[in-house]
Amino acid sequence: MNHAITRGAWVEKTLPTWQRLCDPVARQVSGAWMEALPEEAKQAAGPLLQMMGQMGGMAFGSQLGNALAQLAQEMLTASEIGLPLAPAGTSALLPANIEKFAEGLELPNSEILVFLAAREAAHQRLFTHVPWLRQRLLATVEEF
């Protein structure tokens, strides 16, 4: 599917991939500080530990949401950073961001749009015709 999308739609379309990539990190972050506590502190905190772990996860989620909102202001295409963030087979351009990006460049907007559309189509063609690549790229990020 090829189309122009808004910043909000970019977040919605890429959110499942971001969740896949960030959930392991969120689990590590929420549990890491609890593991570092001395046993006495863990025992004293008792049931509060679980609640504090959940709060840590919520804080991470809030930070991730803010980061995605900022990234949505800067992304030009669905695969801008080289990762297949949108659902398989989805090519997308973000016209508002492209317009902002093109300001001050001494090129016609049509040339910029053609270049970005061709690059996005090339990314999607690569991910479509090399079936294992999408999963391998995402798995590599997850493993890191």
Question: Positions of the model-derived regions?
Answer:
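Auxiliary, metal-adjacent structural segments of Zn-dependent hydrolase domains
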Residues: 1-96
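Hydrophobic transmembrane alpha-helix bundles
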Residues: 34-43, 104, 117-122
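Cation-handling catalytic/transport regions enriched in His/Asp/Glu
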Residues: 93, 108-114, 132-136, 141
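Short pre-active-site segment immediately N-terminal to the catalytic Zn-binding motif
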Residues: 98-118
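Catalytic Zn2+-binding segment of zinc metalloproteases
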Residues: 120-137
